[in-house]
């Protein structure tokens, strides 16, 4: 089957997922300092990182970094974006890649930003480096049970609850483990209402994940295609958005932010701006590197990207991208009206 046939078949089978589902209701979102209504989010960076440890799930252990050093480096950057108008910061570092919810809570309190953390495991290929060895053979149901427990009881005894599910896949066809992780994310979504944000290298991988969600009766609106800007075929982004998935344009740097503007402008031209999320995917403290390595600031979205969007598409588009869409994506859009599991 060639690429065009694959995409056409996937789109046909996913057509029923074109909306977020019937009678959806917004619920509070868990931040590291407590639940917040989506209407209170304000300007939101939906995909950033404070700290990442690439050692691997079987090598991560306490004491690999000094939290005080991380705070010293991260806090000024958080204060900078708050001055630029940011009010909510979504940290996408998952378990076994350096997730530290107590550190996030300290930074949230010190900066005055609302910060959101996650549950889930990060797949992404055959080596499964960031999934604990003992979990690599587990069925989706047992993986989901772990993530649901974090939602219900809090993470690592902290009482801090996740506001979304983070996972990752490699190229297609998805590995058996990646497929189980996506299915586990679907099961967790059905139990908690948390949206799924998946590090996804290609449009083909995005559509394969949406097919797994469809098989579990999970709507496309419960899925964020992270790093969608890396797909060279813009029509795949269009199709994913038409199905109702969230298409995230991130990875903004000094040498590429104008291309990101063009990708967003392309989505807007097709009436799809309502399914677009944007963020810098910046930071972070690199565990194991001297001084934490090259910690990129988070401000580029506010200082360069959004001003250009304002010039090209207007203030309404800016508000949609940085306030309304993140609130809708994270805001607990439920399949059953009146569901109060949040």
List where the protein language model places each region.
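Histidine/acidic-residue-rich catalytic or RNA/ligand-binding cores of hydrolases
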Residues: 54-57, 101, 127-128, 206-212, ...
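Twin-arginine (Tat) signal peptide motif
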Residues: 1-5
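Active-site gating/metal-coordination segments in enzymes
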Residues: 106-109, 114-195, 246, 251-255
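Mid-to-C-terminal alpha-helical segments outside catalytic/metal-binding sites
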Residues: 7-18, 27-34, 299-342
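Alpha-helical scaffold segments that flank or form the walls of functional sites
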Residues: 42-46, 56-114, 141-160
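Divalent metal-coordination and catalytic microenvironments
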Residues: 47, 89, 189, 247, ...
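Short acidic/histidine-rich active-site segments
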Residues: 197, 250-251, 272-295
């Amino acid at each position: 089957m060639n690429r065009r046939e694959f995409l056409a078949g996937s789109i046909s089978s996913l057509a029923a997922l074109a909306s977020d589902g019937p009678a959806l209701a917004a619920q509070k979102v868990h931040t590291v300092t407590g639940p917040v209504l989506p209407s209170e989010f304000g300007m939101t960076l939906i995909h950033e990182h404070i700290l990442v440890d690439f050692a691997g799930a079987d090598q991560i252990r306490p004491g690999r970094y000094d939290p005080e050093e991380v705070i010293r480096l991260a806090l000024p950057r958080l204060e900078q974006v708050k001055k630029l108008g940011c009010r909510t910061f979504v940290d996408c570092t998952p378990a076994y890649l350096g997730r530290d919810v107590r550190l996030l809570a300290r930074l949230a309190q010190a900066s005055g930003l609302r910060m959101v953390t996650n549950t889930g495991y990060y797949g992404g290929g055959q080596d499964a480096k960031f999934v604990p060895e003992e979990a690599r053979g587990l069925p989706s149901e047992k993986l989901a049970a772990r993530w649901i427990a974090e939602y219900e009881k809090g993470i690592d005894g902290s009482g801090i609850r996740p506001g979304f599910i983070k996972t990752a896949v490699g190229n297609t066809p998805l590995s058996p483990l990646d497929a189980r992780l996506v299915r586990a994310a679907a099961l967790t979504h059905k139990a908690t209402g948390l949206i799924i944000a998946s590090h996804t290298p290609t449009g083909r991988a995005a559509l394969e994940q949406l097919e797994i969600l469809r098989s579990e009766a999970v709507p496309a609106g419960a899925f964020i295609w992270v790093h969608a800007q890396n797909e060279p075929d813009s029509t795949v982004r269009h199709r994913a958005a038409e199905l109702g998935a969230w298409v995230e344009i991130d990875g903004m740097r000094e040498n590429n932010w104008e291309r990101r503007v063009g990708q967003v402008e392309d989505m807007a031209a097709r009436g799809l701006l309502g399914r677009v999320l944007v963020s810098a995917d910046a930071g972070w403290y690199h565990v194991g590197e001297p001084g934490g390595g090259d910690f990129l600031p988070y401000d580029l979205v506010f200082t360069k990207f959004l001003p250009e969007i304002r010039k090209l598409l207007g203030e309404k588009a800016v508000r949609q991208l940085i306030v309304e869409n993140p609130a809708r994506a994270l805001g607990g859009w439920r399949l059953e009206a009146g569901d109060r599991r949040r």
